[in-house]
Amino acid sequence: MSATYTDLREKLQSLYRDSPKEVRKRKQPTSDTEEEEAASEPEEEEEARKVRSGIRQVRLFSPDECARIEAKIDEVVSRAEKGLYREHTVDRAPLRNKYFFGEGYTYGAQLQRRGPGQERLYPKGEVDEIPAWVNELVIRRLVEHRVIPEGFVNSAVINDYQPGGCIVSHVDPIHIFERPIVSVSFFSDSALCFGCKFQFKPIRVSEPVFFLPVQRGSVTVLSGYAADEITHCIRPQDIKERRAVVILRKTRTEAPRLEMKSLSSSYQPERLQGSNRQHILKPKRSHRKADPDAAHRPRILEMDKEENRRSVLLPKQRRRSHFSSENYWRRSHDYVDTYTETGEDDGSPVRKVKMRRH
């Protein structure tokens, strides 16, 4: 009988515990491997330096201030459970819930056309406005300490993680959001990792290029190389307790936006009243039981949808190699044949993207 796991952290630990021979082999590499590792060390150090240059971190919120904001986050969760938010405000997944305010955007299975760069903002009014407490308790403090300018934020997302949850390697869509990307952490300490590779079945996460501890009440600002040229993620082993992060961003004025007629949902908030509104705005729930291998995955791997945004169309006869999609866009000039663009009967090129769904 196969073992069962409550979350991904246990499964990651079991992989190393159950495979001592493999561990010993890694501890005793061949001379060729040692030479390759020695040669790559300067490159890794240089990349880590570039990542570090694009990160600003400051501790702004005291424990008392954190507790007050965390109570407000709990209120958001409660309102979502009661179905008091608009349909596209809440996005649920096992071990991770997202709450979009101000601006929301499509991704994964929500996309009409799958692939990098296909994300679209929802029409205005499709998600709820940024709560007053976010402006008063969070954004105002950031403006006062000159972390962001006045009027910068028009999109606020609350990611609420349970122990063992995570988000795979990704780059925030450059065609949707301006830089910097600002996040504020609550409930517990965690870490942000850069340049990790996620592998599934079995679940594995590679060592990061750069590991950034993130404390409760701290503000993390990403720009430059850290925001655009390398992926970031939250690993399951780094979420030991419940953790929430408030992500504050500004959408680009030229960011593509869905038209009302293209939405999968046909409801219009201004026409809803009384029981009709309550009926349509019910909480969104996953219809699939939590799976240790898939619990933390969004509808499409963000590493696929974000990092391949710079991919080029390849001839039909070229096939995808064994290279991982992780970090593909950063080295596309070296491995241009790692992805194949194959058409249907008409032979037209179509971007091939690895899909994973709930």
From Swiss-Prot:
Locate the residues binding 2-oxoglutarate: N159, Y161, H170, H232, R243
The UniProt annotation puts the region (Disordered) at 1-50, 259-312, 334-358
Q: Where is the composition biased (Basic and acidic residues)?
A: 7-22, 289-310
E.C. number: 1.14.11.53
Q: Per the entry, which co-factors are needed? A: Fe(2+)
The UniProt entry, under Pfam families, shows:
2OG-FeII_Oxy_2
Domain of life of the organism encoding this protein: Eukaryota
The entry's keywords:
Dioxygenase, Disulfide bond, Iron, Metal-binding, Nucleus, Oxidoreductase
Q: What Gene Ontology cellular component terms go with this record?
A: nuclear speck; nucleus; paraspeckles
GO BP annotation list: membraneless organelle assembly; mRNA destabilization; mRNA processing; regulation of mRNA export from nucleus; regulation of mRNA processing; regulation of translation; response to hypoxia; spermatogenesis
Bias class Acidic residues marks the residues at 32-46
Textual note on the cofactor: Binds 1 Fe(2+) ion per subunit.
Comp. bias (Polar residues): 262-278
Q: Where is the composition biased (Basic residues)?
A: 279-288
According to UniProt, the reaction catalysed is: an N(6)-methyladenosine in mRNA + 2-oxoglutarate + O2 = an adenosine in mRNA + formaldehyde + succinate + CO2
**Where is this chain's protein located in or outside the cell?**
Nucleus speckle
Locate the active site: Y105
> In this UniProt entry, which cysteines form S-S bonds?
C196-C233
In the record's own words, the domains note is: The C-terminal disordered region undergoes liquid-liquid phase separation (LLPS) for the formation of paraspeckle membraneless compartment.
On assembly, the entry states:
Monomer.
Of which family is this protein a member? Belongs to the alkB family.
Please report the name of this protein according to its UniProt entry. Answer: RNA demethylase ALKBH5
Q: What does the record give as the organism's lineage? A: Eukaryota, Metazoa, Chordata, Craniata, Vertebrata
